[in-house]
Amino acid sequence: TGTIAFLLKLKSSYSFVDALTRAHSMDEDIWKGLMANWHGIDVLLSPDQPAHGVDLQSDATGVLQFAGMIYELVVVDTNVPFGPWALSIARQSDELLLVTTNELSCLQAAQKALAYFDRNRVERSKVRVVVNRFSKDVGLSQEVIEAALHTEVYHTIPSDYETISRSLVEGRAAPSATPVGKSIQQLVEKLTGKAIRSESPKPSSLTNLFGFLRR
C-alpha cells in the first residue's frame, strides 16, 4: 500500500515486483540496485501503482530465500493472509505475526486466517497473534480473544490515536517514549530475544527496530 515509503519518505524506481520478475537471475548487484536505503537499512518498496494479481498469482519463495542469504533478519509486510503469495511468505517465515484488533469483525477475520493457515499446513506454532489498537475499556477482552482463537495473544499494542495521527502527519514513526512506541519496542525485543539500546534521547520505535537490524 506504500505506507513504508510514506513513513520513511523513500522513493525508488524499483519495487518488489521487479525483484519477482528477476528472481531466477538475481545476484547481489541486481538486488542492491533494487533497494531503497534508509539509514543503512535496505528497503524493498511496493510499487507506486497497484500491482494487480500479485497476491493471487505470485510466489515469494525465491525472493525470500535470496534475501535470507544476504541478511540476518528479514521483515516482510503483507496486506492479506490468503492466496499463494501470502502462503509462500508464511511458509518461509520463522515467525508469523497475525495482526488483529479487539473488534468483533476483526476477530472473525483472524479466525478465518488461522483456519486458512491450518488447512494449508502452516505450522500454528510459529503464528504470533498481535492485537493492535487494544483498549481494555472498549472492545473484546484479551481472554475472549484467546478463547475465540484457541491461541494465546502474543502481544498487545495500545490504542494511541493521537500519537499515530501526529506521526503520520509528520512522516515519522511513533516515538519510543509514548505508550504505543514502548509497546512496539517491547514486541521487537520479544521477537529478537535482545534488548534494544537507545541511540539517542528520543528515538522513534521504528528507528530502534532498524538500529537493531544494523547490528
Identify the residue ranges that each predicted region occupies.
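Conserved Switch II/interswitch segment of TRAFAC-class P-loop GTPases
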Residues: 93-111
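Phosphate-binding loop that captures ATP/GTP phosphates
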Residues: 1-43
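Phosphate-binding/switch loop-helix module in NTP-utilizing enzymes
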Residues: 46-86
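Beta-strand-loop-alpha "switch" segments that mediate conformational coupling across diverse proteins
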Residues: 133, 145-174, 184
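Conserved C-terminal guanine-recognition region of P-loop GTPase G domains, centered on the G4
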Residues: 107-126
